[in-house]
Amino acid sequence: MNITIVDHPLVQHKLGLLREADTSTMKFRQLTQELARLLAYEATRDFELESVTIDGWCGKIDVKQIKGKKVTVVPILRAGIGMLDGVLDLVPSAKISVVGLARNEETLEPVSYFEKFVGNLDERIAIIIDPMLATGGSLVATIDLLKRNGCKHIKAVVMVAAPEGVKIVNDAHPDVQIYAASLDSHLNEHGYIIPGLGDAGDKIFGTKQA
């Protein structure tokens, strides 16, 4: 499977706290941002650098900077918004693209209702963020949209993934690397990840869970 599990002690500790059933909205939101920051750190590890000359306090010096166009972060609405601030803490100059996809609870297929992409996607690295990679439909649809708009370099950062969803994404887009805190056991009959986190969107936004 084309997936990187970030097995850092801080990542695993925060994931464990997120899994608690009685975690408050405030705490869940805070932990989501913290975990997103740590996962994004790993996802940006292979960014290409270039040397540039700057004016330092002691004169001109050579330093390293990320080469080429900056990143676009792509939250999948609505739950992906909960991870956005954590990623922007690391790459504050990143442009933000947005994809709105809702899951049909009967067919489990994604339905697009909003798309807004920044310019020059062909020159940017896109980092898709979504707390859960369950069936894989939303992630595949988002990657499809990005590629259709010219994006060539795409990564996906999720907190928890199911094997079924990872396979769907790998089969459709083998060039896209997935980063996750955990590869969980399976999907249940309703398409939810087991053990998972529950409904991450409801927990982040404080809305009623079914």
Swiss-Prot record:
Known EC number(s)?
A: 2.4.2.9
Any one Gene Ontology MF annotation carried by this entry is: magnesium ion binding
Residues annotated as binding uracil? 193, 198-200
Q: Which domain of life is it from?
A: Bacteria
Q: What Pfam families does UniProt report for this protein, alphabetically?
A: UPRTase
Pathway listed for it is: Pyrimidine metabolism; UMP biosynthesis via salvage pathway; UMP from uracil: step 1/1
> Which SUPFAM superfamilies does this one have?
PRTase-like (SSF53271)
Annotated family: Belongs to the UPRTase family.
Function, as annotated, reads: Catalyzes the conversion of uracil and 5-phospho-alpha-D-ribose 1-diphosphate (PRPP) to UMP and diphosphate.
What is this protein identified as?
Uracil phosphoribosyltransferase
Organism listed in the record: Chromobacterium violaceum (strain ATCC 12472 / DSM 30191 / JCM 1249 / CCUG 213 / NBRC 12614 / NCIMB 9131 / NCTC 9757 / MK)
Q: What is the gene called? A: upp
